[in-house]
């Protein structure tokens, strides 16, 4: 029995160590883990360029960061933009924090067309303080993150709602200063407010003023204007936006389409024709009383036989009030024709019906599929009906 060479890179799926062959998409929660690792690589010499690079890596250009918590004087809510986010993280470490990381438990992810939302109701922001005494602060709350659905997967919105916080001290420190009441009193005081240092809180209060001034600062850097001129320009543009009427939505130009006549018109025309025919059968009046040309327009052609001229109707169904379709030019490349592209079809007004000249068309007319079985045109005229004149033009002149 020949033995096959053993593959050192082969891993059985049923073995204790299963190797994943295809890499999966990076989970949004893993981005928080990467952000924690990046914060751990921070040094004391990290300048503004390092913090700008940090914010560019994990936050979108139009990202916003919101903090909500409740202080002694009431609830607070601070929202800062992308330009102020790097400074926010730097103030955390400038306030005496030596380490910062976030822990997410039981987070829920929801995928949308262009974003991924992570909702974690049990988020803990852990900060370690070295001054005045080693203290570990655990700030608990709800963190809602919105990531972009792309390869970078950067944060668009960051909303952290703080519920409670705890400040933890090592037992060894308490045992060392157990006999010193002044030190114990100092250790019993909180070093943070809702898990945030006074340095960070002061910066958030300053952001209330700085955030509306971002437009002035960017205009000053772009156009090199004085602060007073920047303020005048911004106020004038804001006034223009308030005074300007709302823009109307653009309407798409639609080409004209040919429409068939309404069914109500067809029904009225049919009723008019039936009423005229019943009156003809009842009173035995000439067929000239039924003027079809005034009810339904139709195209006609002339046919000359000797010195007599008669009219032959091209569409048999129009005598019963049916629709008349207009012949259009062939459509090229999906184009549509409007009113100016239609053929000009002329017609001849015929005020009376010539029964003598229509004898040769009677058979074809009665067998037309456009007529129904109960149509009055299929019934034979009464034997004692009056004979019409051969020349319709003479009767029209009378």
Curated annotation (Swiss-Prot):
Expressed in adult brain, lung, spleen and kidney. Isoform b is generally expressed at a higher level than isoform a. Residues 323-362 form the LIM interaction domain (LID) domain. Pfam families: LID (PF17916), LIM_bind (PF01803). Residues 245-280, 354-398 are annotated as: Disordered. One of its GO terms (biological process) is positive regulation of transcription by RNA polymerase II. Residues 263-279 have a biased composition (Low complexity). GO terms for molecular function: LIM domain binding; transcription coregulator activity. GO terms for cellular component: nucleus; transcription regulator complex. Transmembrane segments: none annotated. Gene3D superfamilies: Cysteine Rich Protein. Keywords: Nucleus. PROSITE patterns: LID. It is found in: Nucleus. Belongs to the LDB family. Binds to the LIM domain of a wide variety of LIM domain-containing transcription factors. This is LIM domain-binding protein 2.
